[in-house]
């Protein structure tokens, strides 16, 4: 399967979560969906991740993940462009890869994946990137679910 990454916009991403962007003028933006938690035993978790860029396009993968009890937010601290790949839930509960979408984010855009939203592990382009990652965790295997999916590729538009 071949996906073409489209520019990340709040409208296009709304079904999967929330786009995190600073306001264009002085002020504050609130992102209340960034802290969703459905597990009373979980605690908030903040991690800082440094990630090497993808060596070459296209992105080729056969894995998706979700967090059954927590949203997960990626906030760029020092980043170039990066990819957010998402899929709605299929009737069997797994990712519906036939309806998967790929988004090309700018280095000043973050996302919150909603609770239980299938997504690909985040992939950075251009250069080493640093992100803050916020989610809820209880330290068990239930925090993360990874599944194999049919192979797919993500390309940038021509």
How would you label these PLM feature ranges?
Residues 116-132:
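Ligand-binding loop in jelly-roll beta-barrel domains
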Residues 72, 111, 129:
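Residue-level detector of short, conserved catalytic/binding motifs and their immediate flanks
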Residues 83-84, 112, 120, 133:
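Short hydrophobic/aromatic-rich beta-strand segments that constitute the beta-sheet cores
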Residues 1-102, 126, 135-142, 147-148, ...:
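Non-catalytic, conserved peripheral segments adjacent to functional cores
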Residues 104-118:
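Conserved metal-binding segment of the jelly-roll/cupin
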């Amino acid at each position: 399967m071949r996906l073409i990454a489209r520019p990340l916009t709040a409208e296009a991403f709304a079904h999967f979560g929330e786009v995190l962007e600073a306001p264009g003028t002085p002020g504050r933006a609130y992102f209340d969906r960034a802290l969703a938690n459905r597990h009373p035993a979980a605690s908030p978790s903040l991690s800082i991740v440094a990630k090497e860029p993808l060596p070459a396009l296209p992105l080729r993968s056969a894995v998706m993940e979700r967090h059954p009890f927590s949203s997960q937010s990626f906030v760029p601290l020092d980043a170039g462009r990066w990819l957010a790949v998402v899929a709605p839930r299929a009737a069997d509960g797994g990712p519906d890869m036939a309806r998967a979408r790929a988004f090309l984010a700018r280095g000043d855009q973050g996302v919150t994946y909603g609770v239980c939203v299938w997504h690909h592990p985040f992939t950075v382009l251009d250069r080493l990137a640093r992100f803050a990652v916020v989610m809820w965790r209880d330290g068990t295997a239930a925090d993360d679910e990874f599944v194999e999916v049919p192979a797919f590729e993500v390309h940038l538009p021509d």
